[in-house]
From Swiss-Prot:
A motif (Important for interaction with partner proteins) lies at residues 174-179. Residues 157-179 are annotated as: Disordered. One of its GO terms (molecular function) is single-stranded DNA binding. This is Single-stranded DNA-binding protein. Gene3D superfamilies: Nucleic acid-binding proteins. Pfam families: SSB. PROSITE patterns: SSB (PS50935). Keywords: DNA damage, DNA recombination, DNA repair, DNA replication, DNA-binding. The gene is ssb. Homotetramer. It comes from the Bacteria. InterPro entries: NA-bd_OB-fold (IPR012340), Primosome_PriB/ssb (IPR000424), ssDNA-bd (IPR011344).
Length: 179
């Protein structure tokens, strides 16, 4: 099954950082996101969604260091269902996001150290790469911000793979490609 969540929103509270017995960092953030729509009567409506997200490792520590209530972030991860019994024996449940990566969405700050973290944090805990056409112009501000911050690094070079020499090179003329 495919379980992937991408959400842009603002923090509803400061980052709550804890350390697990193993010494690894774990953080919880509250995220608010909204959707605007036109109602049947023609008036504009807004629907707000509040959800918690879990961050782990270095991503949790960086979030704690650079984010605060009101900060805008993009989170990629998976939807997780949590259930527990409270002290009265009542069963509770909720959905949360377990983050694989995080990206700051606020304007670049005057702090160069924060800017460096903003440029690199997205792929901290994720090996995923999206084959998006990030060079194509877009009118959607979300896509523009995502493309500029995540994929505008033209100077990055791929890490050499130990399998790189085992794949034969295929010499095909572009005229032969059917699409």
């Amino acid at each position: 099954m495919f379980n992937k969540v991408i959400m842009v929103g603002r923090l509803t509270r400061n980052v709550e950082l804890k350390y697990l017995p193993s010494g690894s960092a774990a953080a919880t953030i509250g995220l608010a996101t909204s959707r605007r729509f036109k109602k049947q009567d023609g008036t504009l409506g807004e629907e707000v969604c509040f959800i918690d997200a879990r961050l782990f490792g270095r991503t949790a520590e960086i979030a704690n260091q650079y984010l605060s209530k009101g900060s805008s972030v993009l989170i990629e991860g998976r939807l997780t269902y949590e259930s527990w019994m409270d002290q009265t024996g009542k069963k509770n449940s909720r959905h949360t996001i377990t983050a694989d990566s995080l990206q700051f969405m606020d304007k670049k700050s005057d702090n160069p150290q924060a800017n460096a973290m903003q440029d690199s944090i997205m792929h901290e805990n994720s090996n995923n790469a999206y084959p998006a056409n990030h060079n194509a112009p877009s009118q959607d501000p979300f896509n523009q911000a995502y493309a500029q911050n995540a994929y505008a690094k033209e100077n990055l070079q791929a890490q050499p793979s130990k399998y790189q020499n085992s794949v034969p090179e295929i010499n095909i003329d572009e005229e032969e490609i059917p699409f």
